[in-house]
Structure formats: C-alpha cells, structure tokens
Amino acid sequence: MIRIYTQLEQGEAWLRRYSDRLPLFTCILGFTETGLIPGISAAGRTPEDRKYTACADAEFLYYGAEHQPQYPLPPLTAGASPVLISRAVVEAFNMPVYLFNAGLPQSPAIPAIDLGGCPAKCLSTGAAMELTTVEHLFKQGLLWGERLAAEVPEGYVILSECVVGGTTTALAMLTGLGINAAGKVNSSHPVCNHEQKWQLVQQGLEAGKEAGGQGVGCRGDKSPIDPLKLVAAVGDPMQVVVAGMAIAASRGCGVMLAGGTQMLAVYALASAIAETYNLSWQPTAVVVATTRWVAEDSTGGTVELALNIGKNSQYPQIMTPPLLATKLSFANSQYPQLQAYEQGFVKEGVGAGAACIAANLYKNWQQHQLLQAIENQIQRLLDR
C-alpha cells in the first residue's frame, strides 16, 4: 500500500522504524490571498468559497461527519475534500489531533492553537508578510516541534497543511531557493495551471528584489538567499511554521511531512533555514508522504521535483528527501465524488496520503479497509 519514489533505502529504514507506532496528527492552517485569484485553485468553486476551505476542513477533521458545522465543506468543481480521507483514519484509530492556526482570515470553529500569525498577501506583491511575523512564526514552529516530539519519543508526528493556493507559494519558495521547479508542481486542477502559477511567481520574486528584499532571487542568481526573507516576500504562514516544527521535531522523533509539492517546498525551506542559521536537525528522520494522484500526476513532475531538491547549486548540501505515496485507489468506489480523484481532481490535502500510510504502518490497513472507512465518511455526510 506504500510506494517509495526516491531515496529507497532511507525510506525503507524509516518505514521499518515506525511500522507499529500510532503517530500524532497535526494540521497547520494558513491562508494566502494568492488563493483568491480566479482559476488558481479548485479547492473551493469560487474565491469566496476558498476563504473558508481551511476552516471547513479543520472542523470536519476535528468533529467528523455528524457535527453541524459553522463552516460547511465548500462545493468543489468536482470531487470531495481530501479531509474525508484523513478523518476516516484519525477516527478509526483515535489518533491524537493538534490543529494550528498559522494565519487565517477568520478563527476556525474548533479548539485550534493560535500561533499569532496572519494571512499572507498575494505572492505577486513580493511582500506577502512582515519579516517580524515570519520570524515569530518560525520560533513558534520550533517551540511546538519540540513539544510534539516529546509526546511521541519513540514514534513520529504527521505535519499536514491546509492552504488554498499553497502549491503556488510552494513554487515561489522552491524557485527562490534555486531549485528547478517550473512546470513540476501539482495543483487541485486535473491539468495543472503551470503558466498562471509561473507568471505570479516571477512577478513576486521580481517585486521582492525591487523592494530591496536582500536574498530574494530568481533561479540562476548565485548569491545566497535568506530563507526567512524569501518567505516574507513570496511565502505563506504555514510554510515557515512547519519548517520550524520539522527542524525541532526531527531531533527527538520521526517526521512525516504530509503533502506533495507543498511539503517538498517545506523540506527545502527547512534545509535552507537550518544551514543559514546553523541549526541542528536530523534530515534523515524526515520523509515526505503524499498520494499516488500527486506522485503520478502526468501534468506535474513530483518525483523529478524531489530529485531536483538534491541538485541545488545554492544549497549543495540539501539532500533529496524520501518521497512516499499511498497506493490508495478510488477506481472501484461507488461514489462519483471519490471517483473524481482518478480523473485528476483534488489529489491531496489535510495529510490525506500520510494518513493512509499511517493506517498501513500501524495496523496494516489495505485498500479495502481504507476505501470502506472513507466511503463510510461520505455516506454519513450525505445522510446528515
């Protein structure tokens, strides 16, 4: 049920080490005004819907299908929110869940830990966040990473995200760090909107340079980059929090970065921050976990992107992380909302792929058990 796409030996060793452990499941919620641009994301049918996607997903993850939500799951162009997958696993194993508000336009209707961040402006401005906010969020990430690791000293933490428009800020982060990512990221669309993303990223990196953002460069620049300034220019609040959490948690437990493009960007960011600020961490304790819909998306290039992280002239010591994916399939699902995943809609989010990998590691769940649990979630939602 698990395929390793890069760093086979390291990935296998990681899976063996944590094969029977129940992880902590965390989701870091953030927002970028990039997500409001028409056509940028399918994680909510309209820009107005997308303002509330993170709140809705968090509420469903925490309370489940029977709860009458303050923020209902938003209508999608096709498919259903990947939180259905994550919730199915979290509920089945009574997995501890921690939710963090890194910067949302409104407070979620759940007991989330507020990290004192704020939503990011559109990355095209080159001034997405104040540097002081980024530094504060990074410190919060370090603090909570250490706390979470202390809860599972022999286990691992799943660090997941919910940020609409987050694959575009991921492209900006990777490009700014000198990694060849153009045309290789994923999206919630069946065919990735590479051109739209790339134009925004070029605009943002250029604007960041013109505004005097020292260390905000485009691929090909040889000067080293201050990664925190790069986040302030073109990032989103989730990225720097999870980078901090991963660095600190890796010192004491395993870390599963739960997502595709977005978590490859976070891994690269964490590596760059650790080098720039001389912070100790254990990159071999970290894996990136996603779905096969991301890893095998023919309109992206996730595996190539993971490999490119290890071919970076600006940060030559950054290694390619192990990229894992669940083999979960919805081809035989009776629900068209789930079959849509096989047509390329949605693909990943809220740690869906990582949750399935965790279920297989912990209790050897296979395709039929996962599908049954997920279909049970969708039926209860329809019955509500």
From Swiss-Prot:
The lineage of its organism: Bacteria, Bacillati, Cyanobacteriota, Cyanophyceae, Nostocales. HAMAP family: UPF0284. Coiled coil: none annotated. Belongs to the UPF0284 family. GO terms for molecular function: nicotinate-nucleotide-dimethylbenzimidazole phosphoribosyltransferase activity. This is UPF0284 protein alr0297. It comes from the Bacteria. It comes from Nostoc sp. (strain PCC 7120 / SAG 25.82 / UTEX 2576).
